[in-house]
Each structure stands twice: as structure tokens, then as C-alpha cells.
Amino acid sequence: MAMKAQGSQLYTIDPLDNSLLIIDCVISIDGIDTAIDQIETTCLEDTTRTYDAGLATPGTATFVINSDPREPSHLRLHELKTAGTVLTWALGWSDGTGIPPDIDSSGDFATTATRSWLLFDGYMNAFPFSFAQNTMVNSTVGIQVSGEPVWIPKTV
């Protein structure tokens, strides 16, 4: 059975004080993935190419927000993007609405078993502002993912 996207929530840890930064009013999130490169293993006598799996190459994730200069999380995100700070991100799925992650004593996410999670590291590489007729001002924020995302299913 499929899970609804509505009710999902994006979080990161503010490196200034290791506090939880709740990203307000996310509209969509896409591209949290690493593609597996190919290593060609074809011999000259072969008539079809053959491959083995190579290194994983992290991609660029994006999330869209209705940008609001009155929203502290949006201002802080823009500051962190400008600084090029690598952040740890947590995407809480809709199977545990309203359940934020904890932050442990070492400043890492401590996720709960009552919600599914997708954890990944990355720095924001874009924070453009889009102004169009009959819409809210929004930003499609780019994140260069670093390493392999970790998918943690709900267990309770």
C-alpha cells in the first residue's frame, strides 16, 4: 500500500547550537538518491557490453518552500546555504505525523521507532527565489547529497 506525502516533514540540525531546525512549509521534495556508476567489463571477443556495479554517486536533491522572510527557518537555511555548510537532514514520513526526531548528546539525529525516516547529509547548492503572477514566492532549494541516504522504516 502506498503512503501519502502529506504529513511528511523535513528537519536539519543547526550547527550553531545543535538545535532542531524544522523546515516550515515544504511543498515538495525530490531526488534524494545515489546513482550506481557502471564499470565496464567487456572483453574484445564479446559482442555485447557487460558491466559491474561501481561506486555510488550522490545526486542533487531539491525541496520547494514558499519562501517567507518572516519565517526564521527560511532565513537560517539561506544563511547556511551561503556558508556552504554540510548538514544532516531528516525527512519524517507521514506515518508518524507530528513526531520530530531527537538530537543526541553528540549532535546527531536520534530517530523514533514510531515514524519512518530518510536520513542524509548534504550542503545546499542553490536557493533561488521565484516570483510569478498569481503564486506565492517560492524557492527550489538544491542539496548536493553526500554519501548514501539511510531509510529507516517505522517499527512500532
Model-derived regions, located:
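General N-terminal targeting signals
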Residues: 46, 61, 78-82, 106, ...
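Structured, beta-strand-rich domain cores
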Residues: 55-103
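Solvent-exposed edge beta-strands and adjacent loop segments
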Residues: 1-69, 121-137, 149
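Short conserved beta-strand and strand-loop elements enriched in small hydrophobics
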Residues: 11-12, 86-94, 108-111
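Short, charged, solvent-exposed linker or helix-capping segments at domain edges/interfaces
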Residues: 74-76, 152-156
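Beta-strand-rich interaction surfaces with strong enrichment in secreted/lumenal proteins
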Residues: 50-53, 77, 108
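Short beta-strand and beta-hairpin "edge-sheet" elements
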Residues: 96-151
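Short, surface-exposed, polar/charged, turn-prone segments marking secondary-structure boundaries
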Residues: 39, 53, 90-94, 146, ...
